């Protein structure tokens, strides 16, 4: 080394790469039993074959209430619930749908290749997952979902009405199964619906559309009874105060699914009649097997809907088959925690509350 030169040690320079701020969105989160909170959550990341929806309207389902009460071990605290949705495509990872399109869809994400999917009975897919259960749901500003689960919303259908597709399809599927089992046209049947929640109300409206005149709904909430009488133009009664007549109905829909309603259904059904078990509040059974056997009662179960049912329901909603839907209540997403509390306390006449994130 030259005597007049000095060794210069190289310096270690740290290059700081600026970190992009994570995109967040507002969501209604199930935080613990009987508690919902508005919190920031990560914005969905677009994946191949999926879309990111801007949620325009989302309904509170009875199963969301069940989770809210801490009665569904599959839906754990920290989850964004909500599966009755309508929205606009914000980002698309598929050529099937483009940003800006209005859609609703099937919250059941099915495999497409099992025996039930191939039969068109994809509601029974053994490999199914579900929005608002195994992946974040629609109580949020945005949600990701596979594009194959989506159904286009026609221009003459509002997004609030489109958000009723899922529960209305549940009613349609149950009624379709029942009509196959009935021994006479449903228009000629005397019909009893147990429970005047969203499924009971939608079933009553659809049965009226089908021409059923002799229709009665049993509901304990006086506000809901009044709404059902007004919008479905049918008879109602309080089953706590008034007993349903025995052996009187050709068709009974149990939209509650509790021990007491199962017993009521079995007592009310006529020989040769059909009981459709829709609700599942509990599953302990005290069915009168003697009457079931000797009176040739048909007892049916139902689970959600098929893709065909959802598509048919969108068409029915667009044709106003469920009426003007003025009984539906709309609130902002920020009002979601209070909406859950009001539904829990029976303080709203609305059988369906829709939350609006924007």
Regions found by a protein language model. Give the residues of each.
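C-terminal hydrophobic helical "lid"/dimerization subdomain
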Residues: 263, 307, 311-358
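Mid-domain Rossmann-like dinucleotide-binding core that forms the NAD(H)/NADP(H) cofactor-binding site
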Residues: 157-241
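Detector for the Zn2+-coordinating histidines of canonical Cys2His2
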Residues: 4
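Residues in the short beta-alpha loop(s) of Rossmann-like NAD(P)-binding domains
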Residues: 220-221, 281, 305
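Glycine-rich beta-strand-centered segment in the early N-terminal region that forms part
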Residues: 35, 44-58, 71-115, 154-156
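Short, Lys/Arg-enriched N-terminal segments with co-localized hydrophobic residues
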Residues: 10-24
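NAD(P)H dinucleotide-binding glycine-rich loop of Rossmann-like/cofactor-binding domains
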Residues: 111-194
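Glycine-rich cofactor phosphate-binding loops and adjacent beta1-alpha1 units
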Residues: 181-187, 192, 210, 225-298
């Amino acid at each position: 080394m030259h005597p007049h030169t000095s060794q210069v040690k190289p310096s270690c320079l740290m290059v700081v790469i600026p970190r992009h701020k994570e995109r967040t969105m507002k969501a209604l989160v199930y935080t613990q039993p009987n508690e919902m909170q508005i919190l920031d959550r990560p914005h969905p990341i677009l994946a191949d074959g999926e879309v990111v929806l801007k949620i325009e309207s989302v309904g509170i389902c009875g199963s969301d209430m069940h989770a809210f009460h801490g009665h569904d071990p599959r839906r754990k605290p920290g989850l964004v619930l909500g599966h009755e949705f309508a929205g606009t495509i914000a980002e698309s990872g598929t050529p099937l749908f483009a940003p800006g399109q209005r859609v609703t869809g099937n919250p059941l994400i099915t495999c497409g290749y099992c025996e039930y999917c191939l039969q068109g009975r994809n509601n029974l897919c053994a490999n199914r997952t579900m929005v608002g259960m195994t992946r974040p749901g629609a109580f949020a500003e945005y949600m990701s979902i596979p594009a194959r689960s989506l159904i286009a919303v026609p221009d003459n259908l509002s997004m609030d009405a489109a958000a009723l597709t899922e529960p209305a399809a549940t009613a349609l599927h149950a009624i379709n199964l029942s009509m196959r089992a009935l021994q006479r046209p449903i228009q000629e049947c005397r019909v009893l619906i147990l429970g005047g929640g969203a499924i009971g109300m939608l079933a009553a409206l659809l049965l009226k559309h089908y021409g059923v005149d002799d229709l009665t709904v049993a509901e304990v909430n006086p506000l809901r009874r009044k709404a059902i009488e007004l919008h479905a133009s049918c008879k109602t009664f309080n089953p706590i105060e008034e007993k349903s007549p025995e052996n009187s109905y050709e068709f009974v829909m149990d939209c509650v699914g509790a021990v007491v309603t199962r017993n009521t259904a079995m007592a009310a059904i006529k020989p040769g009649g059909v009981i459709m078990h829709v609700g599942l509040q509990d599953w302990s059974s005290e069915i009168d097997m003697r009457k079931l056997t000797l009176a040739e009662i048909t007892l049916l179960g139902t689970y959600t809907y098929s893709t065909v049912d959802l598509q048919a329901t969108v068409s029915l909603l667009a044709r106003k088959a469920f009426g003007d839907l003025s009984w539906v209540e709309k609130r902002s997403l920020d009002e979601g925690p209070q909406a859950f509390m009001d539904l829990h306390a029976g303080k709203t006449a609305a059988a369906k509350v829709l939350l609006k994130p924007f």
